Every structure is written in C-alpha cells, then in structure tokens.
C-alpha cells in the first residue's frame, strides 16, 4: 500500500515504523519538514531514497504527495470490538458510521474523531469503505491514531455497546428532538449515515434514540464528516462544562 504526504507518512513512522518498507523523498526538498521527516526515519533505521519528483508523480498519479511517498504494509486490525471496549478506561466515546462508502468522507471522519478524542470508529464490513490509500491520506495521520473497526453485523454490534451501558444516539432528519435539546450521557456512541441516505432502517431501530441537527438554510443535509464534527464536539463541550460545574 502507498501512503503519501507529510502528515500521513510522519504519523505512520511514529505509530508503526516497522510497517514502512520503502520511503521516497523528493531530492530537491531540503526544507525543515523534509529534514525532520528524514531524521525521524533515520531514528527508526529507515533509509530514505532521494529521487526525482517525476518518479514520485508516477508512483502517486494524483501528484498530491508533497514530495514524500512511502510503501507500507497494510496494518491488520489492532483488536476486535470486544477487546477495544475492554481496553477503554472511563466512559466510552465512539463513532459509528453506517453506509459511508466514500474514502474521503471516511478519512475526514477519522480526522474529526481524532481531534475530539473518540476511542474508535466502527463500521460494517459489507456497507462501508475500507481503510484505503485515499482515506489514509485524507485522515492526515488520524488513521494511525484512531482504531477503525469493521464489524460483521452492525446491528448486533450496537447491541453489544448497549449491553455495556453505552448509549447509542443516531442522527436523522426529522427526528423529534434536536441535538441541542437532547441529553448526552457520558458513555455515548454516535451513529451517522451517509449524506442524503442516512442510517439504514435496522440501524435506526437499534439506536436508543434519534436526534436531528437543526438546519436554518435551504440545504436538506450535511456532509457526514461535517455532521460528525458537530455532534462530537457538542459532546466534548458538554463534558467540559460538566467537569467545570
């Protein structure tokens, strides 16, 4: 698998340097970011190859590599859902994605999840995007810091969360209660569907409750990563307010 760009490659070096097989850096880049990356690679015994940018362009046709490309081993799932839940200290904070098949949306959701301090992102194996090169690049390093757990049966996995007293709240247009009116418990999993489609019926039925994100303009829905940012950071805001009380 290829990963590219300074954020993604630096994160992989810090989180799993042993998975980096080859590292290529634009021979003409001698700025601070390039030097820092080379020093980090050397720290882990990785000898970067300085090559012409044309070679990087051939390796990465999108040409959004910023002068750095790495060939890495695909990382196997770190743990299953039960193991993840066992490892969480304190109230669980999770994001469930149902039907999100666009890798850029997945990457953006991972990035938001990392910023908000989410313990993991959960998605179904048969109705979701895998963690591919585009998702990793869009995540800007978050793919290495936030576990992405793909489960066989999402409805059953939601039941597992609820068995552990984790409240599952889904977002849905037209839900009776808005996000800003709803109580958000300490242990929560937010369930979001793809833009324009929303949560599948069975997923909706498994949620403890549904809330809507108020819309004041003409558009009918938000991009899933934008919606994720709204609900996750509203949760963070309330938790911090509760801590100060």
Show the residue positions of the predicted features.
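Short basic, glycine-rich beta-strand/loop surfaces that mediate nucleic-acid
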Residues: 59-73, 139-143, 147-151, 185-193
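Short beta->alpha connector loops at strand-helix junctions that form conserved
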Residues: 52, 73, 98, 124-125, ...
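RNA substrate-binding interface of SAM-dependent RNA methyltransferases
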Residues: 15-18, 46, 87-177
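A short acidic, often aromatic-flanked loop/helix-cap motif at beta-alpha or helix-coil junctions
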Residues: 54-59, 76-78, 154-158, 176-177, ...
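Active-site/ligand-binding-proximal alpha/beta "capping" segment
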Residues: 169-225
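N-terminal positively charged helical leader segments and presequences
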Residues: 1-84
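Structured adenosyl-cofactor binding patch, chiefly the S-adenosyl-L-methionine
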Residues: 10, 115, 130-142, 201-245
């Amino acid at each position: 698998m290829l990963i590219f760009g300074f954020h993604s490659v630096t994160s992989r070096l810090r989180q799993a340097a042993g998975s980096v097989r080859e590292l290529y850096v634009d021979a003409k880049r001698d700025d601070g970011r390039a030097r820092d990356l080379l020093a980090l690679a050397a720290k882990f015994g990785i000898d970067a190859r300085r090559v012409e940018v044309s070679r990087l362009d051939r390796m990465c046709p999108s040409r959004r590599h910023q002068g750095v490309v790495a060939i890495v081993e695909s990382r196997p799932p770190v743990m299953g859902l039960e193991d993840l839940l066992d490892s969480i200290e304190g109230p669980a904070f999770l994001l469930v994605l149902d039907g999100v098949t666009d890798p850029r949306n997945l990457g953006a959701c991972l990035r938001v999840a990392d910023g908000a301090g989410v313990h993991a992102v959960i998605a179904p194996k048969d109705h979701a995007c895998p963690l591919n090169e585009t998702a990793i690049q869009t995540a800007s390093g978050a793919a290495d810091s936030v576990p992405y757990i793909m489960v066989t049966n999402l409805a059953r996995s939601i039941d597992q969360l609820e068995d552990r007293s984790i409240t599952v709240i889904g977002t849905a247009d037209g839900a009776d209660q808005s996000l800003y009116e709803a109580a958000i418990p300490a242990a929560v999993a937010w369930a979001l569907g793809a833009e324009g489609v929303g949560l599948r019926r069975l997923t909706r039925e498994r949620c403890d409750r549904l809330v809507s994100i108020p819309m004041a303009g003409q558009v009918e829905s938000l991009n899933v990563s934008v919606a994720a940012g709204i609900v996750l950071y509203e949760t963070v805001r309330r938790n911090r307010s509760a801590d100060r009380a």
